[in-house]
Regions:
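Flexible, glycine/serine/threonine-rich loop segments and coil->beta-strand junctions
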Residues: 54-55
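Soluble "head" domains of membrane/secretory-pathway proteins
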Residues: 2-26, 41, 45, 50, ...
Length: 197
């Protein structure tokens, strides 16, 4: 309890106690601590922030672009064909990769002279649109991949310069539990900021 000290007949001054200093410090630190907790929740539970280190997703995403992915998207929804996803690289899980989902669980991906065909679980074959791939980046790669359950086949849009499901050594697929999030938005550079598809 603070003592009241008379200074003049008309005024009183309260002596400062250690308790009021502690309270003042806590009042100062509380908003900072709350802001840090909110930032940690946003970063590790809701959003993933990434800088694109290579040109493997040209022309959709440029080298050096900064993107935000939703960590919640694949917690509540299944990955879909053509999603751009961040995931743990199967050959070294300490690295994160960004690619486009091409083949879904149970499907067969057949690449003939750079054209991608997917045979669904219903037996129907479709040629995938590749209008997001520049004509000069359509390579002559050939290969057939049967996508296991709970796994996905992914490719970079810059197919001539992408280390993706076609070339990995550990496995050619990304398992469901290795996805970090769905890339939703490019926020840098500012002149190209916007939703990504």
């Amino acid at each position: 309890m603070s003592k009241k000290v008379k200074t003049t007949p008309d005024a009183e001054v309260k002596e400062e106690t250690p308790k009021s200093k502690l309270r003042e410090t806590l009042e100062f630190l509380a908003p900072i601590i709350i802001a840090l907790i909110v930032a940690m929740i946003l970063k590790y539970c809701i959003f993933a922030n990434a800088v694109i280190p290579t040109g493997s997703m040209l022309n959709t995403i440029q080298k050096g672009d900064r993107v935000i992915a939703s960590r919640l998207e694949y917690k509540f929804n299944e990955p879909e064909r053509f999603d751009i996803a961040i995931f743990k690289y199967p050959d070294n899980e300490k690295e994160l990769f960004v690619k486009r989902i091409i083949g879904l669980p149970g499907e067969t991906v057949n690449i003939v002279d750079g054209t991608v065909y997917v045979t669904g679980t219903d037996g129907k074959t479709m040629q995938l649109r590749d209008d997001f791939v520049s004509p000069e980046n359509k390579d002559s790669y050939n290969g057939t991949f049967v996508v296991p359950e709970d796994s996905y086949f992914v490719m970079g849009d810059n197919r001539d310069n992408s280390v993706d499901s076609r070339y990995w050594t550990t496995t050619n697929f990304v398992s469901r539990d290795k996805f970090i999030g769905k890339v939703m938005f490019r926020y840098y550079p500012f002149n190209t900021a916007g939703k990504l598809e």
